[in-house]
Amino acid sequence: MPVIKSAMKRVRTSEKAAARNRSQMSAMRTSIKAFEIAATNNAENANELLQTAYSRIDRAKSKGLIKANNAGRKKSRLAKMLSK
C-alpha cells in the first residue's frame, strides 16, 4: 500500500475507473454474444440486438476502451453475420 496521500487517492480512483471499464466491456461482450446467438438462430429480434451491440461498441470506443479500428472490425463482422 502507498504511504503518500496522493498515491492512496490514485489507487482509489484507478480502482473505480477499472470497475467502470470492466462494466462497460462486459456489457459490450454480452450484447455481442446475444446478437450472435440470435443471428445463428435466425431470430426476429436480431436487428434490435444488432443496434444494441453497435451502441455498446461505439460507447466502448468513445470511452477509449477499444480502438477505432477494433470497433469497426467488430461492427463489420456483426453486419456480415446478419446478412448470412
From Swiss-Prot:
Transmembrane segments: none
One GO BP: translation
SUPFAM superfamilies listed in its UniProt record: Ribosomal protein S20 (SSF46992)
Pfam families (UniProt xref): Ribosomal_S20p
Superkingdom field: Bacteria
Function: Binds directly to 16S ribosomal RNA.
HAMAP family according to UniProt: Ribosomal_bS20
NCBIfam families: S20
Record protein name field: Small ribosomal subunit protein bS20
